Amino acid sequence: MPASISRSTYAAMFGPTTGDRLRLGDTDLIIEVERDLTTYGEEVKFGGGKVIRDGMGQSQRTRADGAMDTVITNALILDWSGIYKADVGLRDGRIAKIGKAGNPDTQPGVDIVIGPGTEIIAGEGRILTAGGMDAHIHFICPQQIEDSLHSGITTMLGGGTGPAHGTLATTCTPGPWHIGRMLQAADAFPINLAFAGKGNASLPAGLEEQVRAGASCLKLHEDWGTTPAAIDCCLTVADAMDVQVMIHTDTLNESGFVENTLAAIGGRTIHAFHTEGAGGGHAPDIIKVVGAANVIPSSTNPTMPYTANTVEEHLDMLMVCHHLDRSIPEDVAFAESRIRKETIAAEDILHDMGAFSVISSDSQAMGRVGEVITRTWQTAHKMKVQRGRLAEETGANDNMRVRRYIAKYTINPAIAHGLSHHIGSVEEGKRADLVLWTPAFFGAKPDMVLLGGMIVCAQMGDPNGSIPAQPFYSRPMFGAFGGALHASAVTFVSQAAQADGVGERLRLQKGTLAVEGTRGIGKADMKLNAHRPAIEVNPETYEVRADGEILTCQPLAELPLAQRYFLY
């Protein structure tokens, strides 16, 4: 006869199930399990006296007969598409199946086969998310990659060549020679990488050669001159070669205002960086572009969320990042024109409304590369505290808000940059770039990061201990070394470079994948973040209105996922 056990006992053994709720870290965000794809009474679990043993939950089937390489058991999947529990089967570095794992010879309803060649990762009581994507990287130093990976980011996209002054200010890897060297350098790192060429030119030849060399996208930056002519030329090349264009507009309004920039864009797809404006862009009203159908608006994390310290720290950051001089009044005025508490406050609310679609870092160039995920969830917490539950929520949970915010650093940047056929969600057929979290540490410290189905970093204790013992901290694992690194991570390039055999030409050890589908998309393609309010900015007070409503909120003095999580 069937046995009954309490919900708490079940959750302790197999993880939460349908209707159970749990808190994310020390935030005020509560998620509820929407459905459970496992079968009560037939759950699989590894360990002494448990289910996954020969002839029980483990079948005799070989890999050739369909057995998985790895199964993550009883995981609580947190994805833009939903919050649900399932077993996840991995094969050949990709997500082969999401459903019910086990032995089809002894158990009903099994669609994920466990065999003698299957490794098990225990997902009970853990949250499983897609690896994050940071789409605004200044490649100033290689050490950024470790900080980013260990925070839960598995794909980094941006530009640079190291601590050259062009890179310190702009996310561009300029020219075929530098692009080639950075593609070769990418072979050393256990993370997916993609590089942006410089998009500032008035004639196409200099841009086309960068795309053919391997640039996956092009960046227009005001420090190189984001004029209407450069915007038009860059977008024309991008449309012809299917790469995305990112734009940092003209803060000083020297070559036109936001309306002139939108006219130069001409309805074509573009990814607008730090659309609030503190990171740069038409002062004071670049934020208006969140209402444009063809613009994908994103934020960088130094303004996210708005706190008691946000405004104060930004002036110094600006002076350093843009090679400014405090002794020159015009340089100081330039910096001060970009820091507006009114637009920074409005940014939080526009994210909560789903009007801003992406969050990224702006690494070492006014952003913190290891805090994209943390600051996303701090912002979601702040908005719940200040604005209450979203009107779209059903039940005693924050599922809709949580799904909206996770989309900002997973699926939406992947769609924007033509990578969503490979990454961005927990979905069958996509790369097994996955992150496991203990709920109490969600958003702060991942338990484990998988890249291409192999563990590349994890919380690990004393290597000399008889068991993994405290202190635990995130360390690189076997997937981050040797040939496994090259088999697990990939480098994203343009279709033109892929067709030209860029991997063979540069003797790359990592595989390359081509971006595709970057043109003709827009705000409507941003999952759960497609809202297009009409934005007005008062040019004297900087007051922001969305569809006539004033957008303002107070800075927080204390945040979750902060100092208590980072004592060491």
Curated annotation (Swiss-Prot):
Catalytic activity: urea + 2 H2O + H(+) = hydrogencarbonate + 2 NH4(+)
Coarse class of the protein's main subcellular location: cytoplasm
UniProt remark on cofactor binding: Binds 2 nickel ions per subunit.
Modified residues (N6-carboxylysine): K219
Claim: Cytoplasm is one of the keywords in the record: yes
MF term (GO), any: nickel cation binding
PTM description: Carboxylation allows a single lysine to coordinate two nickel ions.
InterPro entries named among the record's database cross-references: Amidohydro-rel (IPR006680), Metal-dep_hydrolase_composite (IPR011059), Metal_Hydrolase (IPR032466), Urease_alpha_N_dom (IPR011612), Urease_alpha_subunit (IPR050112), Urease_AS (IPR017950), Urease_asu (IPR005848), Urease_asu_c (IPR017951)
Protein residues bound to Ni(2+) 2: K219, H248, H274
Domain Urease: 131-568
Keywords of the record: Cytoplasm, Hydrolase, Metal-binding, Nickel
Residues annotated as binding Ni(2+) 1: H136, H138, K219, D362
Cofactor: Ni cation
Complex and partners: Heterotrimer of UreA (gamma), UreB (beta) and UreC (alpha) subunits. Three heterotrimers associate to form the active enzyme.
Similarity comment text for this entry: Belongs to the metallo-dependent hydrolases superfamily. Urease alpha subunit family.
Protein name from the UniProt record: Urease subunit alpha
Protein source organism: Cereibacter sphaeroides (strain ATCC 17025 / ATH 2.4.3) (Rhodobacter sphaeroides)
Name of the gene: ureC
